[in-house]
Amino acid sequence: MERVRGACQSPILILLAIVLPFPSTSGPAIHPLIESLAARIRQRRAQLPELSPFALDSVMESISGQLDGEELLISNELHRCRGLRKLHLEIARLGGGLQVLHCVFFPDPRFDLPIFGADIVASPAGISAAIVDLSPVGLTMPVALLHGLESLPIPAFQQVRELPAWGSIFSPFVQFIRPASSEEESWFVDLADGYLKALISSVIDATPDASDAASTIQRHKSQLSYCIQQKRNDKTRGVLEKAFNPQWADRYIEEILFEDPPPL
C-alpha cells in the first residue's frame, strides 16, 4: 500500500454538500464517482426519521461565480431530521475541470451521534482525493456504532493519503485515499455506504439527553471545536473570496459549510 503525501491541498476541497445536477450543460459530465456517491447518500438520507428541508436562503441553493476566467458553480441541498441538526450535500464545479463533492451530517448535540463527512475531488485526470469518516463528538464512539464500524471490511486501497495537520478531528476509521481504479472507486462508495448505514441505525435507536446534561454540553463543545477546525482551511476561504467577495465567503462558510451548533 502506497502512502501519498499531501493532505487536502485542492483549492476547494472543503466545499461540502450533496447537490442536484447543475443547470449548466457546458463542460464534461459529473464524474461517475461523484454521481454514484451522491446517489447513495440521497438513498440513505431518505431513510432517516422525520426528515425535512433545512431552511435555506434561495440565493444559496444554486450559486455561480467567476474564478480565473472560469465559471464556478455550486449547488446545495440541506435537510434536518430527528437526531441530526443539519445534513448538507454539495457539488462544486469549476469550468470543465475541477469537481468537488462534499457531504456533512451534523448531529443534534443532545444525541450521542458522530459527524458523518465525505469529500471527493475530481478533475479530467481522475480522482485526486476521496475521504470518508464518522467523527465522534462525544468522549467515545457509541458502543453499537463502534461495533458496526469494526465489522466493516476495509478495502485494500493502493494509495492512502496523509491527513491534514488539523486531522485530529477525525476518527481512527477515517479513510483518505486516491482511488487507483474504477474498482477502487466502487469500493469507496460501498465503504461510505457502510458508514451511512451504521449511522442511520444509530440515529433511529438514539434517544436525546437533556439540553443541560453534562454529556450534551460536552458534545456541543466538541462539535463547536470541529467547526472551528474546519474553518481554518484558508484555501476554501481564499477561493470563495476570489470568486465572490470576502463578505459573501464569510457568510457561506459560517452559514452553509460549517455553521456552529445553536446555543443550548
Swiss-Prot record:
Entry keywords, A to Z: Oxidoreductase
Lineage: superkingdom: Bacteria
Swiss-Prot/TrEMBL GO biological process terms: phytochromobilin biosynthetic process
Alphabetized InterPro entries for the sequence: Ferredoxin-dep_bilin_Rdtase, Ferredoxin_bilin_OxRdtase
Enzyme class: oxidoreductase
Leader sequence residues: none
Ribosomal protein is among the record's keywords: no
GO MF term list: cobalt ion binding; phycocyanobilin:ferredoxin oxidoreductase activity
Record-listed E.C. numbers: 1.3.7.5
Pfam families in alphabetical order: Fe_bilin_red
Catalysed reaction equations from the record: (2R,3Z)-phycocyanobilin + 4 oxidized [2Fe-2S]-[ferredoxin] = biliverdin IXalpha + 4 reduced [2Fe-2S]-[ferredoxin] + 4 H(+)
Task of the protein: Catalyzes the four-electron reduction of biliverdin IX-alpha (2-electron reduction at both the A and D rings); the reaction proceeds via an isolatable 2-electron intermediate, 181,182-dihydrobiliverdin.
Family stated for the protein in its record: Belongs to the HY2 family.
HAMAP family, alphabetized: Ferredoxin_bilin_red
Protein name: Phycocyanobilin:ferredoxin oxidoreductase
Organism phylogeny: Bacteria, Bacillati, Cyanobacteriota, Cyanophyceae, Synechococcales
